[in-house]
From Swiss-Prot:
<dbReference type="InterPro" id="IPR004498">
    <property type="entry name" value="Ribosomal_PrmA_MeTrfase"/>
</dbReference>
<dbReference type="GO" id="GO:0032259">
    <property type="term" value="P:methylation"/>
</dbReference>
<dbReference type="InterPro" id="IPR050078">
    <property type="entry name" value="Ribosomal_L11_MeTrfase_PrmA"/>
</dbReference>
<feature type="binding site">
    <location>
        <position position="251"/>
    </location>
    <ligand>
        <name>S-adenosyl-L-methionine</name>
    </ligand>
</feature>
<keyword id="KW-0808">Transferase</keyword>
<feature type="binding site">
    <location>
        <position position="165"/>
    </location>
    <ligand>
        <name>S-adenosyl-L-methionine</name>
    </ligand>
</feature>
<feature type="binding site">
    <location>
        <position position="208"/>
    </location>
    <ligand>
        <name>S-adenosyl-L-methionine</name>
    </ligand>
</feature>
<keyword id="KW-0489">Methyltransferase</keyword>
<feature type="binding site">
    <location>
        <position position="186"/>
    </location>
    <ligand>
        <name>S-adenosyl-L-methionine</name>
    </ligand>
</feature>
<dbReference type="InterPro" id="IPR029063">
    <property type="entry name" value="SAM-dependent_MTases_sf"/>
</dbReference>
<keyword id="KW-0949">S-adenosyl-L-methionine</keyword>
<comment type="similarity">
    <text>Belongs to the methyltransferase superfamily. PrmA family.</text>
</comment>
<dbReference type="GO" id="GO:0005737">
    <property type="term" value="C:cytoplasm"/>
</dbReference>
<dbReference type="Pfam" id="PF06325">
    <property type="entry name" value="PrmA"/>
</dbReference>
<keyword id="KW-0963">Cytoplasm</keyword>
<dbReference type="GO" id="GO:0016279">
    <property type="term" value="F:protein-lysine N-methyltransferase activity"/>
</dbReference>
<protein>
    <recommendedName>
        <fullName>Ribosomal protein L11 methyltransferase</fullName>
        <ecNumber>2.1.1.-</ecNumber>
    </recommendedName>
</protein>
């Protein structure tokens, strides 16, 4: 037997009351989709691990709210809907406007829970050479030069199509010539490490402060045989890392890039490149100045929408 989702279209001010009604009438879980919540989000807001939030990339309502309650198979739906409609209408007696107060129900196939979200993800060409492909998609490269980055978007840390990721993939395409060693800081899904291997990088290390991210990266790396030898580990930025590589890449936010800058400089060979993005436009000058103050030479800046990427290099002795 299948579960039932009962959806109440309502106003922002009535969301809490409607949620209570659904719970009180037997819903085992409630989901709130409120336009007001999306309006509060600002580009660059981030969580404890520097997750990037760009509201324009999130599916959302333009106005009002929808509160969905999930009811077990034993529920007598017609009676439940009538009860909910009556109780929602009475909210006006308590000074709340529940309009439009539409109530509808749909049956949920148990099998749909696991796979319904997959219909929103399709192969995306992110650079001339690189295409991101969801794990379940059958996809044939259009040209001999096209390289595939196979990801499982069902994991945490996104699909690789955010503007900052696109900037980093473009930067990798510019910077890599083949055989370079690289450290991927804040690897998340592992997409940059996979792309680097596809573009000819040599030895690659992928670090993240979050062990969930590292597990996600490992699974995605396993989906791409070319990246099977990428080293992974839990680490805070480059704390305790002392090596010499050709590239350090980081798609993290400005506040987190700043303490990374001296660590990146230390871990790069002379002439090595530092590629970074996750920089919202209001923080671009601050990050650029910090990179230059450390001794880097900024070679190129790139922009998509409100986000910036920077390609810089550590001067070789002959440049002094």
């Amino acid at each position: 037997m299948n579960w039932t989702a009962i959806v109440v279209e309502t106003s922002t001010e009535a969301v809490d009351a409607v949620s209570y009604i659904l719970t009180d009438t037997g819903a085992t879980g409630v989901k709130i989709d409120d336009a007001a919540d999306y309006q509060k989000l600002k580009p660059g807001k981030y969580g404890p691990y520097g997750e990037i939030v760009d509201p324009s990339t999130l599916p959302h309502r333009e106005e009002g709210a929808a509160v969905t309650g999930y009811y077990p198979p034993t529920t007598f739906v017609p009676e439940k809907i009538a009860d909910i409609r009556q109780r929602v209408a009475k909210l006006a007696d308590f000074g709340l406007n529940p309009a439009p107060a539409r109530v509808a129900a749909e049956e949920i196939d148990n099998q749909d829970w696991a796979t319904a979200w997959q219909k929103y993800y399709h192969p995306v060409r992110v650079t001339r050479e690189l295409t991101i492909v969801p794990q379940w998609e059958e996809y044939t490269p259009a040209t001999a030069d096209e390289k595939l980055l196979v990801l499982d978007p069902g994991m945490a840390f996104g699909t690789g199509t955010h503007p900052t990721t696109q900037l980093m993939l473009q930067a990798l395409t510019i910077a890599l010539r083949g055989g370079e060693s690289m450290i991927d800081v804040g690897t998340g899904s592992g997409v940059l490490s996979i792309a680097a291997k596809q573009l000819g990088a040599g030895e690659v290390w992928a670090y993240d402060i979050d062990d969930v991210a590292v597990k996600s990266a490992k699974k995605n790396l396993a989906l791409n045989p070319i990246a099977k030898d990428v080293h992974t580990g839990v680490n805070s930025l480059l704390d305790g890392i002392h090596t010499q590589v050709d590239l350090v890449v980081a798609n993290i936010l400005a506040e987190i890039i700043l303490p990374l800058v001296p660590q990146a400089f230390e871990n790069l060979k002379p002439g090595g490149k530092f590629l970074t993005s996750g920089i919202i436009n209001t923080k671009f000058e601050t990050v650029k100045k910090a990179i230059e103050a450390q001794g880097f030479v900024v070679d190129e800046t790139m922009r998509i929408k409100d986000w910036y990427g920077i390609i810089a290099h550590k001067p070789a002795p002959e440049e002094a």
